[in-house]
């Protein structure tokens, strides 16, 4: 059986989600997405010309990808809901990544407003993937509100600082019966692989790919890292030990 990630009505074989911001051009973005094999692509609605969407970056996203508009720029649940409704009305589908940010220095998500927006949009039939500051109680409330998956940050968005919240993410993976998709802060393929080895369902990467010297090659590197991390998780990582343990007998062969 294929190792598929089921979210909403989609069965995904790629566990790398890609953001479309910060690329030098739409053409490079499209090439990077294509080389990565990603099936879910997130885009900020405020960058899309809704009067002529086919002349925006949407034109360069490979056919067959699931488009996941995000509510970047929303400061309240009400603003996030409004953006999501506009996206669906414009033909962008019913997937939405909820981003509600009131902190303008670290761009940390407002978990309280995120729960409110999730509950409203889930009731309206959206497939809601909320971006959140990792917190077990909030994650439980997001699940109760109807989230299809939960997207905790690894580090502040765009920072490329890696999995600074790894222990909190590990708790969510253990305790929440929903796909946990690590979003924000991942700066290296090795960090994406670590998230997958921990048991994350997927990772979302943007800045680390878009701002690399060769974004297309970096997208491929992340794809391979995510695949390797998932394979390692399914294979079962060997336990760590405090002391050394020889792989071959140390006594008896000289007798």
Swiss-Prot record:
1-deoxy-D-xylulose 5-phosphate binds at residues 158, 184-185, 206-207. Pathway: Cofactor biosynthesis; thiamine diphosphate biosynthesis. Keywords: Cytoplasm, Schiff base, Thiamine biosynthesis, Transferase. One of its GO terms (biological process) is thiamine diphosphate biosynthetic process. It catalyses: [ThiS sulfur-carrier protein]-C-terminal-Gly-aminoethanethioate + 2-iminoacetate + 1-deoxy-D-xylulose 5-phosphate = [ThiS sulfur-carrier protein]-C-terminal Gly-Gly + 2-[(2R,5Z)-2-carboxy-4-methylthiazol-5(2H)-ylidene]ethyl phosphate + 2 H2O + H(+). It is found in: Cytoplasm. GO terms for cellular component: cytoplasm. GO terms for molecular function: thiazole synthase activity. The active site is at 97 (schiff-base intermediate with dxp). CDD domains: ThiG. Belongs to the ThiG family. Catalyzes the rearrangement of 1-deoxy-D-xylulose 5-phosphate (DXP) to produce the thiazole phosphate moiety of thiamine. Sulfur is provided by the thiocarboxylate moiety of the carrier protein ThiS. In vitro, sulfur can be provided by H(2)S. PANTHER family: THIAZOLE SYNTHASE. This is Thiazole synthase.
């Amino acid at each position: 059986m294929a190792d598929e990630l089921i979210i909403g009505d989609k069965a995904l074989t790629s566990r790398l989600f890609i953001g479309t911001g910060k690329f030098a051009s739409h053409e490079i973005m499209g090439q990077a997405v294509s080389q990565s094999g990603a099936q879910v692509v997130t885009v900020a609605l405020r960058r899309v010309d809704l009067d002529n969407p086919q002349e925006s970056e949407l034109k360069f996203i490979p056919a067959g990808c699931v488009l996941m508009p995000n509510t970047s720029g929303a400061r309240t649940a009400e603003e996030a809901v409004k953006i999501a409704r506009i996206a669906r009305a414009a033909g962008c589908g019913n997937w939405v990544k909820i981003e509600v940010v009131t902190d303008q220095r670290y761009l940390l998500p407002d978990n309280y407003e995120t729960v409110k927006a999730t509950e409203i949009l889930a009731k309206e039939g959206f497939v809601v993937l909320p971006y959140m500051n990792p917190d077990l109680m909030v994650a439980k409330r997001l699940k109760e509100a109807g989230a299809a998956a939960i997207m905790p940050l690894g580090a502040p968005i765009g920072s490329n600082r890696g999995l600074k919240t790894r222990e909190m993410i590990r708790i969510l993976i253990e305790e929440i019966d929903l796909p946990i998709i690590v979003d924000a802060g991942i700066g290296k393929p090795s960090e994406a692989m670590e998230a997958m080895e921990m048991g994350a369902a997927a990772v979302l990467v943007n800045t680390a790919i878009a701002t690399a010297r060769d974004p297309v090659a970096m997208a491929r590197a992340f794809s391979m890292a995510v695949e390797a991390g998932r394979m390692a998780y399914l294979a079962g990582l060997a336990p760590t030990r405090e002391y050394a343990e020889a792989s071959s007998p140390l006594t008896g062969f000289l007798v």
